Amino acid sequence: MSFRLFARPLIQMPKLAAPRCINITPIRPISASAISLKTNTSTSTKENVHDLETFFKLIGRDCIEHLDAFESDLQKFLKTSSKDMKNMGIDVSTRRYMLRWIHKFQNDLEPLREHKRGKKKNGGERNAKTVLAKRTALKRLEEKERFESQELEAERKGEREF
């Protein structure tokens, strides 16, 4: 007895004629508007911000605290380097945030707005497993203690006999 690995199909499919011309038209037109080419329509742009206090209020994150360090002068702020900001006593995360906004403001890349700080979930990516494990262990322990207290209460009332 022999088995055929490749059986012929029961119904032969008709062969279609090859197309004589190939029409290659895109389904939808390609957009040429990149993010960098779009115009900035916001009111908080380079043309509308003339003082440092307004700038700091728009970018948020309590940068207004450092207004005195720059003597409320926008041009002085825009020319300040990271090293100078460090010498002024501005912490690293705020300093980097300000420097990013200086770059975006000078090149008119983005309207001024506050970027919220990220919030860690479950202690951050590295510690997530241990934090979740501790949390579930504490839940189990609380459940166990609650069950034991209920059992003791039931035994005291005489509902359980051991």
UniProtKB/Swiss-Prot annotation:
Keywords: Mitochondrion, Ribonucleoprotein, Ribosomal protein, Transit peptide
Transit peptide boundaries: 1-37
Region (Disordered): 112-135
GO cellular component, one term: ribonucleoprotein complex
SMART domains on file: IGR
Subcellular localization(s) per the UniProt record: Mitochondrion
InterPro entries, sorted: Ribosomal_mS41, SAM/pointed_sf, SAM_Ribosomal_mS41
Pfam families: SAM_Ribosomal_mS41
PANTHER family to which the protein is assigned, alphabetical: PROTEIN FYV4, MITOCHONDRIAL (PTHR28235), SMALL RIBOSOMAL SUBUNIT PROTEIN MS41 (PTHR28235:SF1)
Family, similarity comment: Belongs to the mitochondrion-specific ribosomal protein mS41 family.
Function as written in the Swiss-Prot or TrEMBL entry: Involved in telomere length regulation.
The protein's name: Small ribosomal subunit protein mS41
